Amino acid sequence: MSAISPKIQNQIAMLQQVQQQMQTIMSQKTQYEMEIRENRRAEEELNDVPQESAVFMNVGTVMMQKPKEKVIASLQEKAESLELRVKSLEKQEKMMQAKFEQLQAQVKEALEGGNRPPNAA
């Protein structure tokens, strides 16, 4: 069996790099989706709390009492921001998937072409 050409080795390395980037994007997306669910759950719980109840919110490393409406608004704003990030990551994921499939096809074609004897047509 012949050695793999430097061009194919480079394509394989690029394929692995794209795969790692896709995994990173999917991991971030999963993390953001989990944060969105947590925010929505907290918002639902706050809606069930009586208006006069004390509500606290983390501000940096300190917990401060805030009006219920402000805490709910803050949760909604954060969830919306996270949803935008998720959409952005989904676009990146689609682009990476297309790039991955293209590189994969190129590598497969190069490997099959390199192992095939020339056809006399």
From Swiss-Prot:
It comes from the Archaea. It comes from Methanosphaerula palustris (strain ATCC BAA-1556 / DSM 19958 / E1-9c). This is Prefoldin subunit beta. It holds the Pfam family Prefoldin_2. SUPFAM superfamilies: Prefoldin (SSF46579). The gene is pfdB. Heterohexamer of two alpha and four beta subunits. It is found in: Cytoplasm. NCBIfam families: gimC_beta.
